[in-house]
Amino acid sequence: MTGIGNREPEHGAGAHVGAAVSVPDAASIPHSPLPIPGARMRAPRIALIAGEASGDILGAGLIDALRRRYPDAEFVGIGGDAMRSAGCQTWFDASELAVMGLTEVLRHLPRLLKLRSAFRERVLAWKPDVFIGIDAPDFNLPVERWLKQRGVRTVHYVSPSVWAWREKRAEKIGVSADLVLCLFPMEPPIYAKHGVDARFVGHPMADAIAYQADREAARAKLGLSTSSTVLAVLPGSRHGEISRLGDTFFQAAWLVSEHLPNLHVLVPAANPGCKQLLAEQLSRSSLPVMRSHLLDGQARTAMLAADVVLLASGTATLEAMLVKRPMVVGYKVAPLTYRIVKTLGLLKVNRYALPNILANEDLAPELMQDDCTPERLCEALLDWFKHPEKVAGLQSRYLALHAQLRQDASARAAEAVAELLTQRELGIGNRESGGAGS
């Protein structure tokens, strides 16, 4: 996720992931179902922070699920339209945390620190029963730690990518959070090694996407025929990513079109700034204008309508997997960054795309850094276009991974929070101090 919590390498979604890892089925994951709490002296008070749009959606789903358990619960915090619609009283809007890149963060740092201080003092005075920080670890973990030291139960929802790099962060996260809610099944075992309570709840995106999504409907929405040959190209959702990958991706698409002359290319733009940059790159490419479609958003629709997807490594690879599309994954970082990471051995994975990490096998070709060339990308893309039998086998593997992640994440997250609330009610569990809400 973007925002004040800098993007984690997602190459996303424990231990050394390149090694064989036993991933438990949902049914085998330790799980303590609790009855819906009945006789409470008062409805629980729950504070939350979501720092961007994706966290706002997660927060809204969690609030809805908690409301089913606690109809009179009170919710306050930092969030957006989705959380407000779910009934959260937002003291500050999530947009106030949505800054990207080191330069922008530094420019806004005094304001962000002032906001964080004001929020934590106000929420402590409000006496919450639990505080839930949703992603944005750079902002939320210090809030969680400060509140935990004053006796507030704390939850961190969405684990940083401890399986990819800096695993020792898991122990530090446990200092801030009583409970970590994880989207991926390989994450809780890492936290367990460091004595931290972490639960796999599943991924909300897997809940939202049908097992068999309607490609014909997606094509109709975009004005494409069912017989069209379609490639979706997603070079990223940030200016830096698009600058590094866009020209390479569009050259690769042009090379594919030399073999498939009637190829349609779909290019979804995450926002107006990205759209302008993508338009400039498309104008420099040799792709036929009439068959290049620059879209406002609609990334999922574009992937669903496509025969094959070319995309940057990141969360989009998970979405492409969930709509069951064969993909080729490319990524480049600044050369100096790449040399530092390789030299110091900071990354603990030998796969980068989330489908490959989840499956612990190479389901999607990955072409990184110097290997990410138009020619190599074209070769990998044509392999999918020309071998439909391989696509059929891939889709069955994607379906199994989809089922593994589809756990009704909001309900499972609410159940884990309810257990924490019950422990608090009964005085169970270690507390840093006996402060707020005790």
Curated annotation (Swiss-Prot):
Biological processes annotated in GO: lipid A biosynthetic process
Keywords, comma-separated and alphabetical: Glycosyltransferase, Lipid A biosynthesis, Lipid biosynthesis, Lipid metabolism, Transferase
GO cellular component: membrane
Pathway noted in the entry: Bacterial outer membrane biogenesis; LPS lipid A biosynthesis
Top-level lineage group: Bacteria
Catalysed reactions listed for this entry: a lipid X + a UDP-2-N,3-O-bis[(3R)-3-hydroxyacyl]-alpha-D-glucosamine = a lipid A disaccharide + UDP + H(+)
Annotated Pfam families: LpxB
EC number of the protein: 2.4.1.182
GO molecular function, one term: phospholipid binding
Keyword Transport belongs to the record: no
Statement: the UniProt record of this protein carries the keyword Nucleotide-binding: no
Family statement: Belongs to the LpxB family.
Function: Condensation of UDP-2,3-diacylglucosamine and 2,3-diacylglucosamine-1-phosphate to form lipid A disaccharide, a precursor of lipid A, a phosphorylated glycolipid that anchors the lipopolysaccharide to the outer membrane of the cell.
Protein known as: Lipid-A-disaccharide synthase
